[in-house]
Amino acid sequence: MKKIILLIAFPIIAFAYTPTTEKNCTPIDLRNETLGEVRDQHDISWCYAFTGADMLAHSFGVTETMSAADIAIGHNETRVGLFVRWLDLNLLKRKNPVTRQMAHQNGFNKVSLLAAMKNGWCPESIFPSDSWTKMSRAENGWLETQVPLAQAMIEISALHEIKKTLTTKNIPYYYSFKNVDASGFVQLLQNKNISNFYSDLRKAVCRDDRHAFSETGKVKMVIKNPRIFTRISKQLESGRLVGLDYDSRILKNSSNRGVKISELHTSGLVGRRWSSENKSCEYLIRNSWGTDCTNSGYDPSYECEGGNLWLTESQIYQNMTSIVYLPAM
């Protein structure tokens, strides 16, 4: 908790870093079938949960895609998650009504990893993270459509506002999941606040499909320091992904330097190589904006491989705040 508060209070720690030499920058690529293609968080700020799902799957050899939605909502139930939500609603985004209509989005990779290892994981096929199934009342029954998650949350909030008037006979639409039909959805809506609705939804949907991890380990968080790349390389060399907390503006502007709290983003580091052109060790960032390299807004100077981008140590260091990793057990 102390490190997380420090991260919020001091997002920029300006020290010169120790660059990795060419000799110590041997090629590493940890992408495999377990990770699969880069996923797309769309308009939901659950980057830390998508990265966490990758880290857990890769570390524990889970071949089935994990639900990032499950990880994110699990994070929101922790003390840190509750505090960050309060901070968002009361200090950072109190003038934005949309914030109150959705499951809380901002979070910390370390906290979500610890909660997920404690709670177990739910498959993406059971609790999707990109779109949800909407059932709209029609003349001859229910009409089924897929709705992007951000829009689904806004529509669920609208129902929550009138929850006392709703029954299975008059609800205009609901969202269908395993273990949750129209009746169950109406019952879940009766929660006093929207965050409790999502907590109970997650538990109901995943109750028959939650898997425990084979073992639980430690989660390390290291704040930016001059020898941070030594720590990163050690983890990559041991076959471990590294979660990177940094300013997302560097993805769209290669000249960006510095960190704004409102621009904090989390991605995974999945590879390393030496660039003779840049005379620098480069790292492969596995982002969560999908596989499209052309229309995702990335700086055109970057080499992009299906949503994975190569950045130099200098670019990473001057825009980062910390790393998180699961040390080998």
What are these regions (language model features)?
Residues 41-57, 101-114, 265:
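Active-site nucleophilic cysteine motif
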